[in-house]
């Protein structure tokens, strides 16, 4: 995920001060590949796999720290919703790992935020999303629309304020090596 040129564009917008002082971060990585309780027990259900926090949460945590720097404090909860699953041999196994993990975080910079990892999110195929709010604007991103970053600026005239789409293209490195025009991916 960190190779996505739109992440670098977001980082540049933040570094340039276009959002003003950053006041909050919200991130989620949610998918639905574990949402059906009839789905069989897999290697992902083994405690050594770490559950949803290790499987999906690691990606949104890496994104958060890439954009805003190190996290210094965490308060969270992890829950197991589907407590038993059948194996491929039709035996029942107890689940001892988390299905959903939610955390409140504070970055070293003082910015606060929330992070969620959820593999029971019915309908979500690749919801690796973040929103960053500042005193002068905001950005938001969804991996399901990986070529797009949305920017809101308080400096826009009131009658045209709103999130505007930035599309990845040749101006967004390293897309310049293979992308001839915006909108191609």
What do these predicted ranges mean?
Residues 83-94, 102-107, 130-131, 136-185:
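C-terminal glycine/acidic-rich active-site capping loop/insertion
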Residues 49-52, 118, 180-185:
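Active-site rim elements
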Residues 31, 80, 119-121, 145, ...:
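Flexible, active-site-proximal loop/turn residues at the rims of small-molecule/cofactor binding pockets
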Residues 19, 106-109:
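A short, structured loop/turn motif at beta-sheet edges
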Residues 112-114, 138:
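Short, mixed charged/polar active-site loops
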Residues 2-95, 149:
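Predominantly a Rossmann-like dinucleotide-binding segment in NAD(P)-dependent oxidoreductases
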Residues 58, 117-125, 184:
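Glycine-rich phosphate/pyrophosphate-binding beta-alpha loops
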Residues 95-97, 111, 124-128:
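Glycine/proline-rich active-site loop of Rossmann-fold NAD(P)-dependent oxidoreductases
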């Amino acid at each position: 995920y960190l190779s996505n040129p739109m992440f670098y564009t977001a980082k540049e917008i933040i570094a340039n001060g276009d959002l003003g002082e950053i006041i909050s971060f919200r991130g989620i990585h949610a998918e639905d590949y574990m949402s059906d309780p009839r789905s069989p027990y897999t290697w992902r259900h083994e405690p050594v796999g770490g559950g949803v926090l290790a499987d999906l949460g690691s990606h949104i945590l890496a994104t958060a720290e890439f954009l805003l720097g190190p996290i210094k404090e965490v308060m969270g909860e992890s829950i197991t919703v589907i407590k038993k699953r059948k194996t491929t041999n039709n035996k029942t196994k107890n689940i001892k790992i988390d299905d959903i993990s939610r955390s409140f975080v504070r970055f070293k910079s003082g910015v606060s935020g929330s992070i969620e990892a959820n593999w029971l999110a019915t309908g979500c195929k690749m919801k690796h999303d973040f929103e960053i709010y500042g005193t002068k604007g905001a950005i938001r991103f969804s991996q399901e629309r990986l070529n797009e970053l949305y920017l809101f600026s308080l400096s826009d005239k009131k009658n045209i304020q709103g999130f505007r789409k930035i599309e990845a293209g040749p101006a967004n490195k390293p897309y310049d090596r293979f992308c001839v025009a915006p909108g191609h991916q």
